[in-house]
Amino acid sequence: MEHAPLPLKDVFHLSPPRDRPSLAFPLGLGDAGLHEICEASHGDFAAMTGFALAARAHRKGPIVWIRQAGLKQSHGLLLQAGYREISTNISPCLTITPRKLSETLWATEEAIRSGVAALVIAELEDTDFTASRRLALAAGRHGVPVLLLMPYSRDGATAASARWRISPRPSSPNRYDPKAPGALCWKAVLERSRQAPHMAGQSFDLELDDETLSLRVVSGLAADPVATRPSWAQDRIGPSHLRQSA
């Protein structure tokens, strides 16, 4: 007995293609998953905060900002005036200041699981692989992007999608007044990347677009190796209008 061949479309049911994370800058930062953003040197915390706010994807909904008390004393608080100068989307922001690292990690995970936050930002003194994995799994499960802001001493293994190392750069020339400061600029080094490991060590020269308040790459992708960070660090002057002393 002969059987007529079945069309392939009746045999195989192809699933729709899954969205893959973009391999272009900033690799999904603030849009999906867990990203670490770290100082390149001591004193870069204000510049690092500005980078995080400018580079993040703009999602509707409140931000939960968790700040470990020790970092609040060392690096100050976020100024709303500076926030408005660097971001077009001024979302409602709930600030939490736990005292201990363990409390900060717990609050971060609870914020992810709350179902309320569109973005969770946590300032931590440090973390380990196990804690970062818990946060990464929670971020993926609940679809909430997470940014961890950490000092220059951060090192070691991580479960984050990427680790960025941020330093300020001299502002670009002001086209209206050559004696006045121009747009804010940063250097961002992709120190680690799970979705694009071949890009680890690449650096981006970035500038804040004053009209759109978004970051643009001004010199393309450079194949600079990650510089070895010294045990001591030279103080830098970041965008001082962004944070104030506690």
Q: What are these model-derived regions, one by one?
A:
Residues 48-52, 107, 131-135, 139:
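A short acidic, amphipathic alpha-helical/loop segment
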Residues 66-127, 142, 150-155:
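Long, charge-dense
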Residues 35, 164, 188:
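A broad, low-specificity signal marking well-ordered, structured residues that form hydrophobic/aromatic
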Residues 170-246:
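C-terminal functional extensions of proteins
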Residues 29, 112-113, 140, 156, ...:
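Solvent-exposed alpha-helices and their adjacent loops that cap or buttress functional pockets
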Residues 118-177:
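A contiguous pocket-lining binding segment that forms or flanks enzyme active sites
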Residues 1-65, 69, 76, 82-91, ...:
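Detector for small/aliphatic-rich hydrophobic stretches
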